[in-house]
């Protein structure tokens, strides 16, 4: 499992599990076959779409747009676009991250 990965490096980790910190630019609770969260995440190297498929409602209540979160998830390709499938997520306190990253 790779840690501290930047958006620009995600293509090197396709189908691998990563742990990384991102700023939440957008958060949307959606209904499909199941309820899920669609996220737009960013770091200083770019942005990426991410999805949270399990326990969407309860996880959605734990963070908001503008928060920095740490995710554990898998880098996937969908319709030739990279995205993250989030397995675990936690909002970080300011002391847990460096805004320069």
Give the ranges of each region predicted by the language model.
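OB-fold single-stranded nucleic acid-binding module
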Residues: 26-38, 46-101
């Amino acid at each position: 499992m790779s840690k501290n990965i930047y958006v620009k490096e995600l293509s090197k980790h396709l189908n691998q599990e990563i742990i990384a910190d991102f700023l939440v630019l957008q958060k949307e609770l959606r209904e499909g076959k199941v309820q899920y969260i669609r996220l737009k995440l960013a770091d200083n190297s770019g942005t990426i779409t991410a999805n949270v498929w399990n326990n969407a409602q309860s996880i959605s209540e734990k963070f908001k747009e503008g928060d920095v979160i740490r995710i554990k998830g898998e880098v996937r390709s969908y319709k030739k676009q990279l995205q993250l499938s989030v397995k675990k997520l936690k909002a970080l306190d300011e002391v847990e991250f460096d805004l320069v990253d």
